[in-house]
């Protein structure tokens, strides 16, 4: 889905950027994943019934 595409591009940018594997501490990969997943899931959980979310997973 869209969230996976965004996450993959973010990870590729972090790994393949000018700094190579040097990732700024304020933008660690776990934090990026947490922020992206929360940004994607929070509105879905609030707006859609649990059954719809189960189908998406």
Swiss-Prot record:
Annotated compartments: Secreted
Domain of life: Eukaryota
Keywords: Hormone, Secreted
Intrachain disulfide bonds: none
Molecular function via GO: hormone activity
Primary localization class, coarse: secreted
UniProt entry tagged with the keyword Secreted: yes
Family per record: Belongs to the somatostatin family.
Protein name in the entry: Somatostatin-2
Lineage: Eukaryota, Metazoa, Chordata, Craniata, Vertebrata
